[in-house]
């Protein structure tokens, strides 16, 4: 895939622009970080050249001048919400985030529990856990009338009931495990607390998507709409920016809806607002670092199709209606893409049709397509991985990397001792067997050395993957989709 984004140019421009905003504010700046600070896989998929750690690398330029505050919604703790991309709970992700920030040399010692109510026992337990770990925890309550009653919100009965976070640096980055965590309210509550203490402070937003200086229906912006289809977010033209500057800028519904209130709050807190529009609040320079628009458009279309398949599978797993996939289908239509644009889909379905059993296909980074079929020894995903490694290593397809003699003892262990009904090897078992074989086989060693070249490849399977295969593909960095059907009929399914 062609590079479409200049990582180094972005880091340089973005850090400079944040400093310019700090000078404009002239005091403490609370910077709300939308999206993922690191592990930003979505951005890396739709902007080829953007690395998952791009934003944190940019902030490293400002490391000695900032501190990081993590917000988490108490209701998300009660719901045991998880990060789907990492398959960990928000609770654990807060700890993971702080660990990574500290390993990179950032000051991170504060957590804000937002929208806490007295019966949020899970959140209260988590608060105690954080405090035992030496972290400072501030509690923000549910404020009646938020976010519409500005006069009450900006008062002792509003933000005044929240605990104030004593920050020590003039750039405070507010981040969270996911959307809806209360980052904006945390920033505004802190500005209120600063105002009560005579401290000058302001607010800015760093949201990667939608990209304000790309057209409303640019595929990169549409890919963001597909990614947030479960939140019912939509991209819109910023009406305030258009009125103030007679210039079109892309924003999204929640920012536009909250802007009048935000502007009013800033005026009540500091006498005036520096912003005429939601776009003005942002400091995003991502659009200015795109160097190949066509490459980014194609990458974004592929991401939209992947999101569509993910929605179909999620709806099948959870036995939900097709609301989210239907929304993404509309986005696909706007972007001018279909499932046929994902080349691996047709090839995987061809394998299933010709064999009468589940099939799998992968598109290598040079465009070659490799398939895998279900056999008595291997599941189709495991077979596909072996075939792809052989293709990459230049090993003839007829060569067996694993002998039946090495596979059969593993099958016996699974079915006779570990209670598995399925004797076929999963991808993890195949890779372990291949690693063992590599000790004595030059051919197996050559194949294993190609494992790193699967990263970023597209895969499609004709049945919903089990958790093991799904986890292995995630760890390998493979972009996998599935047809929304199971291999066998059953009511109970292990996850």
Curated annotation (Swiss-Prot):
Protein name (Swiss-Prot/TrEMBL): UPF0371 protein cgR_2887
Entry-linked Pfam families: DUF1846, DUF1846_C
Record's signal peptide: none
Family from the record: Belongs to the UPF0371 family.
HAMAP family per UniProt: UPF0371
Highest rank taxon of the organism: Bacteria
Record InterPro entries: DUF1846, DUF1846_C, DUF1846_N
Gene3D superfamilies on file: dip2346 domain like, Domain of unknown function (DUF1846), C-terminal subdomain
Originating organism: Corynebacterium glutamicum (strain R)
């Amino acid at each position: 895939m062609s590079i479409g984004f200049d990582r180094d140019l972005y880091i340089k421009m973005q850090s400079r622009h944040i400093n310019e905003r700090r000078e404009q504010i002239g005091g403490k700046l609370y910077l709300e970080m939308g999206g993922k600070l690191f592990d930003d896989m979505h951005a890396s998929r739709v902007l080829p050249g953007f690395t998952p750690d791009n934003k944190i690398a940019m902030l490293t330029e400002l490391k000695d001048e900032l501190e990081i505050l993590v917000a988490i919604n108490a209701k998300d703790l009660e719901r045991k919400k998880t990060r789907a991309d990492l398959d960990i709970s928000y609770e654990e992700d807060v700890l993971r985030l702080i660990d990574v920030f500290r390993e990179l040399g950032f000051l991170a010692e504060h957590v804000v529990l937002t929208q806490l109510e007295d019966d949020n026992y899970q959140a209260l337990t988590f608060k105690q856990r954080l405090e035992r770990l030496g972290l400072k925890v501030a509690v923000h309550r549910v404020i009646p009338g938020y976010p519409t009653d500005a006069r009450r919100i900006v008062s002792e009965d509003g933000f005044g009931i929240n605990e104030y976070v004593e920050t020590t640096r003039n750039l405070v980055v507010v981040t969270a495990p996911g959307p809806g965590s209360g980052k904006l309210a945390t920033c505004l509550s802190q500005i209120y607390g600063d105002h009560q203490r005579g401290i000058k402070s302001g607010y800015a937003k760093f949201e990667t998507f939608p990209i304000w200086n790309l057209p409303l229906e640019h595929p990169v912006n549409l890919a963001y709409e597909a990614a947030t289809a479960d939140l019912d977010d939509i991209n819109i033209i910023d009406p305030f920016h258009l009125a103030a500057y007679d210039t079109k800028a892309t924003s999204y519904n929640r920012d536009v809806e909250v802007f009048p209130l935000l502007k009013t709050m800033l005026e009540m807190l500091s006498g005036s607002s520096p912003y005429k529009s939601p776009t003005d609040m942002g400091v995003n320079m991502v659009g200015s670092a795109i160097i190949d628009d066509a490459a980014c458009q194609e990458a974004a279309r592929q991401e939209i199709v992947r999101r569509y398949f993910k929605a179909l599978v999620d709806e099948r797993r959870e036995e939900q209606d097709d609301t989210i996939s239907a929304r993404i289908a509309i986005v696909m239509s706007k972007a001018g893409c279909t499932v046929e644009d994902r080349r691996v889909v047709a090839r995987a379905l061809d394998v299933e049709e010709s064999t009468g059993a589940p099939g799998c296909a992968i598109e290598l980074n040079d465009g070659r397509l490799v398939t895998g079929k279900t056999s008595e020894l291997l599941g189709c995903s495991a077979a596909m991985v072996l075939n792809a490694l052989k293709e990459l290593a230049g090993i003839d397809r007829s060569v067996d990397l694993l002998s039946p003699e090495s596979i059969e003892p593993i099958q016996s262990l699974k079915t006779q001792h570990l209670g598995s009904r399925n004797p076929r090897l999963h991808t993890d078992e195949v890779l372990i067997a291949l690693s063992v074989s590599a000790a004595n086989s030059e051919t197996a060693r050559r194949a294993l050395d190609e494992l790193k070249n699967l990263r970023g490849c597209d895969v499609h399977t004709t049945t919903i993957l089990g958790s093991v295969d799904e986890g292995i593909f995630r760890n390998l960095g493979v972009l996998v989709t599935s047809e929304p059907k199971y291999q066998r009929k059953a009511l109970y399914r292990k996850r």
